[in-house]
Amino acid sequence: MHAFRTHTCAELTKDAVGQTVRLSGWVHRVRDHGGVLFIDLRDHYGMTQVLCDPDSPVFSQVEKVRSEWCIRIDGTVKARDESLINPKIPTGEIEVFIRDMEVLGTAEELPLPVFGDQEYPEETRLKYRFLDLRRESLHDNIMLRSKVVQSIRKRMWDIDFTEFQTPIITASSPEGARDFLVPSRLHPGKFYALPQAPQQFKQLIMVGGFDKYFQIAPCFRDEDPRADRSPTDFYQLDLEMSFVSQQDVFDTIQPVIAGIFEEFGGGRRVDTDWPLISYRDSALWYGTDKPDLRNPIKMQIVSDHFAGSGFAIFAKLLEQEGTEIRAIPAPGGGSRKFCDRMNKFAQEQGLPGMGYIFWRDQGQGMEAAGPLAKNIGPERTEAIRQQLGLQVGDAAFFLGGKPASFEAVAGRARTVIGEELGLIDQDRFAFAWIVDFPMYEKDDEGRIDFSHNPFSMPQGGMAALEGDPLEVLGYQYDLACNGYELVSGAIRNHKLDIMYKAFEIAGYGADEVEKRFGGMVNAFKYGPPPHGGCAAGIDRIVMLLADTANIREVIMFPMNQRAEDLMMNAPSEPTGEQLRDLSLRVIPQE
């Protein structure tokens, strides 16, 4: 007999009745029923009920067992009485009578119980993550992640992609976040960086003559945490292809992503129609570049109905250049109570408020109500209703100004309206490609900077770069699903003259480009092929499949919101010897 087990805790069925078996696992819980001790014994695979009566030679030992002790038992498999069968577990038709037991590991008083789904503070869960991982929901999430990664690999191999590994220690490069720097012992005063993404390396793989590359790549970014983003590191399906157009990339990755969601989505509907929406239209209609298309609400510009109207705030606002009035339809939101609640929401988001109109049945016909309706009159309110396609019982909310001043709040309001009015289908995955991203934007100081990936090919090539930088569009694209960005990619700029010009517009001289991207600049002198690709966030994919809003629920050992590993006490202070080896000195903060 094996030293620890003949079967797992999910394996025994009625076919094993009468057999002597050996099981090992953790004590999930102990119950005393009339002097007979019942133990739910748990391992990675499942649960088996084992019991010990006073006639057992190890009864006195079993009495001492507590939750989460690790034990090995030998016993006889018996069938449960018909009335005691548990159909919820594979072993629910049998139980094992203990005849021998060995304690493999005791457990101190638990800082959080493994049994049950009671919520505990996240700090406690992260400090004792090894215990938290034993809990069924988190254990299942981590196993789901493993299966998703395995399936992704197989799907990529099946379409002739080759998996390569790229360096983890490399040079710093501007990719939208802060680098994690690594001091060099052999080169005092110089630093490596952990890669924010394998961006340059995967492009160099294409220059190296390989056709289709992928890897499940770790990425390191010193970012502020969010619920859907880890503050230090994450994993992505990274891929690149030679001799491809933007549509080729879509046609390649779409079946992979759709297949993963169909395989692991638990029966939820996976949309087959993935519309292409321009970045500007997405911002206009949804207030974000990662829209949730399960929500049917589509915002519209209604400036014409307020220009010269009796609502002076909007009328005067529209006299300023670059302003507009945008409407958020709310089907079924036609009550003053709901409208007032949404107005308060806008105020909580830092805006003065949100105007509204709602339509009600007055017996003699439809009537528009609310402060705006009184100020602009029945003809304008009726024109708004017809434009938005609203009926009795519906409402519309209005925000005005320059789009940058209210667009994000409008997007959040659209989400809240959809959630509160029950408009969002929770059993659906809705995808959309967001395309035609602007190449450049102005930073907080008014300087031109890259808005996304600096290595993207501008639409129109060199000619486009000769005009207004803020009008230049790139061959950049994102895939949004249910309000999250899942995939981001681009057709790359493989022409050195266009690359130099693109960086020059963003304030990088040729010398700096060569210094920071010397490897790629040098490679592009030797016949670089047209190429493009994308990366899909593994963490976010699994987060959606697991139906959780917190990315830490699908990462085995995540950091907390302050980028701390409470279990391993990281970050920690280096020793003096370590600092001397690296020729470093810590300057205390004042």
From Swiss-Prot:
HAMAP family: Asp_tRNA_synth_type1 (MF_00044). Disulfide bonds: none annotated. Its EC number is 6.1.1.23. Aspartyl-tRNA synthetase with relaxed tRNA specificity since it is able to aspartylate not only its cognate tRNA(Asp) but also tRNA(Asn). Reaction proceeds in two steps: L-aspartate is first activated by ATP to form Asp-AMP and then transferred to the acceptor end of tRNA(Asp/Asn). This is Aspartate--tRNA(Asp/Asn) ligase. PANTHER family: ASPARTATE--TRNA LIGASE, MITOCHONDRIAL, ASPARTYL/LYSYL-TRNA SYNTHETASE. Residues 199-202 are annotated as: Aspartate. It is found in: Cytoplasm. ATP binds at R221, D222, E223, E485, G537, I538, D539, R540. L-aspartate binds at E175, R221, H452, R492. GO terms for molecular function: aspartate-tRNA ligase activity; aspartate-tRNA(Asn) ligase activity; ATP binding; nucleic acid binding. It holds the Pfam family GAD. It is an enzyme of class 6 (ligase). GO terms for cellular component: cytoplasm. PROSITE patterns: AA_TRNA_LIGASE_II. GO terms for biological process: aspartyl-tRNA aminoacylation. InterPro entries: Aa-tRNA-synt_II (IPR004364), aa-tRNA-synth_II (IPR006195), aa-tRNA-synth_II/BPL/LPL (IPR045864), Asp-tRNA-ligase_1 (IPR004524), Asp-tRNA-ligase_1_N (IPR047089), Asp/Asn-tRNA-synth_IIb (IPR002312), GAD-like_sf (IPR004115), GAD_dom (IPR029351). The record marks H33 as: Important for tRNA non-discrimination. It catalyses: tRNA(Asx) + L-aspartate + ATP = L-aspartyl-tRNA(Asx) + AMP + diphosphate. Keywords: Aminoacyl-tRNA synthetase, ATP-binding, Cytoplasm, Ligase, Nucleotide-binding, Protein biosynthesis. Its main location: cytoplasm. NCBIfam families: aspS_bact, PRK00476.1.
